[in-house]
């Protein structure tokens, strides 16, 4: 995969990168990636694709064995209880629930991307894994499982969720930023033609590290364009940033004025009250 420079996204990111909201920073970024694979990407892709396919085949085999055993038990129960219609009904009802209940081995076979026995489903998941590794080079998402992702059912739900989250932190969001955000994304990725996924944060990833008070992330994937836009946003405590910079945690906690001075020294972004939209 390859990072795509976009002047429109750069303009949005200059505003989203470091929004001062008092004792914390709202740090968001929009990144565009091409799904065309280079030499090293192809090697990683083949390795992950083989691993996911083998895991899918293994779990599918386990499910077939389970279903076969259930069918055998069903026949045995019917034969042994042929003299009692009530027992037959009870046994059949119990088996029906058991057969229709999700198997713990089915997660890899039926995923947010579709059946993992399907190469297209595996390809989509691998794209998202590779993108996460590029976006967060200090972390490794290679071992991520299908259940760590979620497919969003509706573009409108995603838009409403992002608007609500950002409006809670950004002054005059609906007046100055909302229209620019969504018109830019529409021109970049054709939102109506996108599949939208999110990554579910787990311990040890950048969305759950110390100081992250809130986060969201969305992948807007346009198959026909072979392009993904990744929208990541984290609400990070200024105090944690101060500690990460090497300050002595035994010192008295800084007051708000000290936190603001530290922020102004290390970040070039404007505060909310001095927003500049190009």
Curated annotation (Swiss-Prot):
Residue ranges of the region described as Disordered: 59-114
Keyword vocabulary terms for this entry: Cytoplasm, Nucleus, Repressor, Transcription, Transcription regulation
Keyword flag Transcription: yes
Key word Transcription present: yes
InterPro entries in the cross-refs: Maf1, Maf1_sf
Gene Ontology biological process terms, A to Z: negative regulation of transcription by RNA polymerase III
GO CC terms of this entry: cytoplasm; nucleus
Subcellular location: Nucleus; Cytoplasm
Composition bias type Polar residues, residue spans: 102-114
Composition bias type Low complexity, residue spans: 64-101
GO molecular function: RNA polymerase III core binding
General function of this protein: Element of the TORC1 signaling pathway that acts as a mediator of diverse signals and that represses RNA polymerase III transcription. Inhibits the de novo assembly of TFIIIB onto DNA.
Family membership: Belongs to the MAF1 family.
Protein name listed in UniProt: Repressor of RNA polymerase III transcription
Species name: Dictyostelium discoideum
